[in-house]
Amino acid sequence: MSTDADTFPADTVDAPVLRFAGVGMRYGRSPEVLKDISFALRPGSFHFLTGASGAGKSSLLKLIYMAEQASRGRVELFGRDINAIAPADRPFLRRRIGVVFQEFRLLEHLSAFDNCALPLRIAGGKPDHYRGDVAELLGWVGLKARMHARPATLSGGEKQRLAIARAVVGRPDILLADEPTGNVDQGHALRILRLFVELNRLGTTVLIATHDEDLVARSGQPVLHLEGGRLMQYGRSGSR
Amino acid sequence: MSDAAFDVQRWRPGPLLPRRDARDGALVFVVAVLCFLACLTALGSLAADRASRGWSSQLSDSATVVIQPRGAESPDAAAARAAEVLAGVKGVTEARALEKEKAEALLEPWLGREALLDDLPIPRLVAVELDPKGPASAESLDKALKAAGVQATVDDHSVWIADIKRAASMTRWFALGVCLLIITAAAAVIGFATRAGLAAHRDVIEVLHLSGAETGFVARLFQTRFATAAGLAGLFGAGTAAAIAALVRLAGGGQGLTPVLPLAWIDLLALLPAPLMAALTAAIAARLSAAAILREMG
């Protein structure tokens, strides 16, 4: 495994926002898709998660947003062992995580505006308090003219931007994005990256799983690289 | 509404569950049919209960006295005297000597018309109506007859009453059992249908769950949705059953269907809880199913 000055071994970061220690994961009885993963992310850091298809990027993200459980090892989020968190407390932890799903997971019967406002609504916010923020954010991702549109009428790129807007609208402490620029053109990809960087400047820890080598190179942000379910590198994008 | 017409200031949050779903129609239909069947069975069991109580009451409120005339006294005179004596016994509301023709009519099915010869000693009968609140015992009737010098046998139907009461009790329990079985089956099917409806919305649940929705938040959404649907279906099923019962009551009158299964208008009140029970069952099933699905999701 190669590292550089920006590497964050699991046991060398004080109060990490996220820490993996010897984590393995398998689906059912199948072979492990993640093996011996150990790393830690500082609060407010920005990382890319790279690797070929099937390398385990999505699985690693699922462990963080608690859609799956590690079969071994320990995952800590905001200083708490995920496996030890009571089910009743998990929703409150999830509200601190913004997720851009690879398959978007938009609610088809709701408008773009409603989809974007969903996390704020679930958190118990009052519409009068957040409607302005939602409108502004949708304008920022280029969906100002599509606020009332149902997801079925949106293009792939528009859906992706809507999914991103929904993930960041609640100003999460950590943002996870699974191929967030997979369906958008270069211009929109850079705009989305700028949004993530902006959010990161406000203190959100960002972890983006992507195939987009160009985006990674342009950003100059550190990379976690997975190969065959193993973490092979963490460091600057140019250091591989 | 076109996108251009979208007014942010007037926006109100949309429903988190799709408004209409073809599966909801199936749920409403199944619940309505089951509620209808459960209500009909409930009415049937009420009617069976009333019928069985009626049979027992009719038999225990009467007695038959068989007169055996002695000496020169004619059978008719002996029967008339016995009726007079019995009418004065405490716990007797009416005692009536049956004419010879009535006694013959009772015997005819057993002996045939030809056997009823004029010189055949046909026993005279006295029909005694007892006070339901404090009926006279067979012993007190017998004692009064003996005191008046009338030789007679008192039959208080006790042999028949025991059998009838046993049969009536069995009918009542059977009807109640069937009713409970149908209600349980209805509740189970409502539960399964609700679970199936909920599973169909798993994608919505997953998004809400991963966005930080608490179990109670998700459960309430489905609880309200399915309880409303099941309540309306229950109302429809119970309403149809009530309409049929009312028709039976009106068409039956005193001679038609109602003497066999006597329905009273007040019985229809028993159907009132049906929609509520359907809604409650669906709400509980929805809550448990939502909680189970969320538990599976972690």
Summary of predicted features, one role per range:
Chain A
Residues 175-178:
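Catalytic Walker B motif of ABC-type/P-loop ATPase nucleotide-binding domains
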Residues 110-118:
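Short coil-to-helix segment of the ABC ATPase nucleotide-binding domain corresponding to the Q-loop/switch region
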Residues 65:
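Helix-to-loop junction immediately C-terminal to a conserved catalytic motif
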Residues 150-154, 158:
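Conserved ABC ATPase signature
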Residues 73-81:
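Conserved ABC transporter NBD signature motif
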Residues 28, 82-98, 199-201:
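ABC ATPase NBD coupling module
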Residues 149, 170, 202:
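Conserved signature/switch motifs of ABC ATPase nucleotide-binding domains
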